[in-house]
A protein has these predicted regions:
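N-terminal subdomain of nucleotide-sugar transferases
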Residues: 1-46, 50-57, 193
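Membrane-proximal helix-turn-helix segments that form the acceptor-binding/catalytic region
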Residues: 27, 85, 89, 108, ...
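A short, well-ordered alpha-helix in the C-terminal region of glycosyltransferases
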Residues: 358, 365-380, 392
């Protein structure tokens, strides 16, 4: 099949192929006839400067040191931008490209695209995060309107002004692109982030050993950063274990992030070390074993300017495994889980504990919600239902496939 064109993907958040959404997008475009190149940072176990995986050429650069303050974050973004520009020039010389497709954060890759647009290259902005809202949610409401916040808004505007096409992860983000970004609606497409039905064709069997000697298991999957609410879950666990006297439940928290060590210390300070197990990052097969065994899965992301508008991938993975969910009552949580979750009053940790306990004590409700979530995933929320929208977006940019 003749190539429909060449796409260069830029990302800074995770190495490829670890970033699952990006990898599904790239393989979908490859299967549709595009030649795919990608640039990303290195990360264990993907540390080769160049390799080709499943027909996708990947260039990687060494990651910068972990950032801890505004100056170090600024240096991290500049370092990654310069590395990405260097490799973009190398890709242009070696393979060429017609389209630059960049995922944020950060909102800086538009400046690379702007250098190539005079030469006929087009730019697709894949809007993964609301960076201005992320900054305020992470560092507090007092940061709204400060110089860094205003700078992030300006960088975001650069994305919207430069983009020939915007891909949003949900309708809330699409509204931001059309409203704050002033992008014409016909150039903004919603491509959601559900996991693939192929990956979750079956649900793994329950592994009772993961409950660590107790009859019930509560699980969390995801990033552990200040805005992710894992501290809310730990304080809800303290209510269940110490206030409610529950000795029949274990908690397994899967993932890592900036707050990982701080959260382990908080768990110990709350007297939960016997009940809470932190796994760190683990292979997909082990993640799926934990989720398949969990009696309740929790999405404790608190209400803030970012989370209320964001789709949480953890909810979709819980649904794929047929698990009942407890979450705070946020706009996009309700869109994703619908009737498959119990919703706690936003940011009320005691109500979060109450909703978890309600599910722990009602096996029939757990079963109904789990069946609902599995069915909803298979029938409407899996990646396969979003793949076609990505390809439709590219048809508006590059024209339909000659085989269509």
């Amino acid at each position: 099949m003749a190539s429909r064109g060449s796409v260069l993907h830029l990302s800074e958040n995770l190495p490829l192929p670890f970033d699952r959404r990006v990898w599904m997008e790239l393989t979908a475009l490859r299967d549709a006839g595009f030649t795919i190149s990608a640039i990303c940072p290195m990360g264990e176990p993907w540390t080769k400067p160049y390799e080709e995986i499943d027909g996708i050429a990947i260039w990687r650069y060494p990651p910068p040191p972990l950032a801890s303050g505004f100056a170090s974050y600024a240096w991290e973004f500049l370092y990654c931008w310069l590395q990405t520009l260097r490799l973009s020039i190398a890709v242009l010389a070696r393979r060429g490209f017609d389209v630059i497709h960049a995922a944020n954060p950060p909102d800086t890759f538009w400046a690379i695209a702007a250098l190539f647009k005079p030469f006929g290259k087009r730019y697709v902005f894949d809007h993964h995060d609301l960076c201005p809202e992320l900054y305020v949610s992470r560092f507090g409401p007092a940061k709204a309107g400060t110089l860094p916040h205003r700078a992030l808004l300006q960088l975001e505007q650069g994305q919207f002004r430069t983009a020939d096409l915007v891909i949003s992860t949900n309708e809330s983000y699409r509204g931001i692109a059309i409203g704050r970004g002033r992008v014409p609606p016909e150039r903004v497409f919603v491509v959601r982030s559900g996991p693939s039905r192929e990956r979750f064709a079956t649900v793994r069997p329950v592994d009772e050993s993961l409950k660590r000697g107790r009859p019930l298991l509560v699980a969390y999957l995801g990033v552990m950063a200040p805005q992710d609410g894992v501290d809310h879950l730990l304080r809800a666990a303290r209510v269940l274990v110490h206030d409610r006297g529950r000795r029949d439940v274990s908690f397994t928290l899967v993932g890592a992030g900036d707050s990982f060590e701080e959260l382990k210390a908080l768990s110990a300070a709350l007297g939960l070390s016997e009940f809470v197990h932190f796994t760190g990052r683990i292979p997909d097969a082990d993640v799926e074993r934990v989720l398949a065994t969990a009696d309740v899965c929790v999405c404790p992301d608190p209400k803030n300017p970012l989370n209320d508008l964001s789709t949480m991938n953890k909810i979709l993975e819980y649904m794929a495994c047929g698990r009942p969910i407890v979450a705070y009552d946020l706009r996009e949580h309700r869109f994703s889980a619908a009737d498959g979750a119990l919703y706690a009053t936003p940011n009320d940790e005691r109500d979060l504990a109450r909703q978890i306990e309600r599910l722990l004590d009602d096996p029939a409700l757990r079963a109904r919600m789990g069946e609902y979530n599995r069915r909803r995933f298979l029938e409407s929320m899996a990646w396969e239902f979003n793949r076609s929208e990505l390809l439709r977006a590219y048809e508006t940019l590059c024209g339909p496939s000659k085989n269509a």
